[in-house]
Amino acid sequence: MSIKKSILFFLVSFFSFSQSYFLEVGANETEYNYTNENNVSLETLEASSGLSFKVGMSDLFFETDEISHSIGASIQSFNATGGRGTGMDGTGLTQVDSYEWNTTFVGIFNELSIPILNKGISVAINSGIDLSVLLDGKQKISNAIFDLNDSDDFKGVFQTSKVGLSIKINESIEFGYSIMYSSGLKNIGKGDDAFNMKTNQVSLKIIK
């Protein structure tokens, strides 16, 4: 069974047993750490924005006052831009050297939340793991567009590790900030020579 079919099966099973659930929307700002096939790092890459959507359930398997557990499904956009823009070479011709990545990943997540303050509002430390695959992606180099599904850097399962803080202002509304690191499972342990992503995320969670 492919991971995309597994996610669909997970969602159907998830809502069959769900009694309380949440919807989380967020904004991502992602930086790529990218080395091309010639082992040259692209120093001109810049962070770019994207969106995040999650649906999940808390405390499905266990519930304590000291820790909260959440599982669910996610859709994430990890994007980047770069290049030196437009200029003139020695022949007087205009040279365009620009890059743009637009991606959509779909996956499942597993998170823990540990409260550190609970006086009127609740503040918690959050950590978690997201396993995802590229659903759709395009790379634009100057005026040429390439399908990232054909790129070895984006094939396979990606692992995203997360750590952050959240503020729950009432039983239904929670705001969060997280730092996330994403890498293909095949690249874990290879250091800076492998393609990876760092993302800053702000989010709003609506709890049912």
Identify the meaning behind each predicted range:
Residues 33-41, 81-92, 135-145, 187-193:
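Outer-membrane beta-barrel translocator domains and adjoining extracellular loop/strand segments
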Residues 32-36, 78, 150-208:
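Predominantly the C-terminal beta-signal and adjacent terminal strand-loop region
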Residues 49-56, 104-110, 123, 131, ...:
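Hydrophobic, lipid-facing positions within transmembrane beta-strands of outer-membrane proteins
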Residues 21, 63-69, 118-123, 171-175:
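Repeated loop/turn-to-beta-strand initiation elements of outer-membrane beta-barrel proteins
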Residues 27-33, 59, 75-81, 114, ...:
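Transmembrane beta-strands of outer-membrane beta-barrel pores
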Residues 56-63, 113-117, 166-170, 205-207:
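Structural signature of outer-membrane beta-barrel channels/translocons
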Residues 19-62, 199-201, 205-208:
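Short glycine/proline- and aromatic-enriched beta-strand/turn motifs that initiate or cap beta-hairpins
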